[in-house]
Amino acid sequence: MSALDDSIRVEVKTEYIEQQSSPEDQKYLFSYTITIVNLGEQAAKLETRHWIITDANGKITEVQGAGVVGETPTIPPNTAYQYTSGTVLDTPLGIMYGTYGMVSESGERFKATIKPFRLALPGLLH
């Protein structure tokens, strides 16, 4: 674990996209808006993403790749980077979590943690 691991805060907002979902076909589309806040003293570049997505049936999908939404943003100190993406589940409920592979301005590699967050149809959970 690097001292830089805590320099990035990840905030998440999710939304069920009813118009593009098809419950009768077990296709539930969710969007998620991620805000990555650099609380550190140096710029940090997001190089990779690693997601683990689990639906209510326990089906696990792992997603790894370069950057996010086609970008590898450099986030200056005390600023934030925001993007929106999406995922399709076979069930109306699931969770996602993961990490971003980051590199600091000084070249140190570290992981930014994306804490588990819920994907759920509105009104499904009380």
Swiss-Prot record:
GO BP annotations listed: error-free translesion synthesis
Pfam families found in the cross-reference section: DUF525
InterPro entries associated with the record: ApaG_domain, ApaG_sf, Uncharacterised_ApaG
Chain ranges passing through the membrane: none
Domain of life: Bacteria
Residue intervals of the ApaG domain: 2-126
Listed PANTHER family: F-BOX ONLY PROTEIN 3, POLYMERASE DELTA-INTERACTING PROTEIN 2
HAMAP family from the UniProt entry: ApaG (MF_00791)
Name of this protein: Protein ApaG
Organism from which the protein derives: Shewanella sp. (strain MR-7)
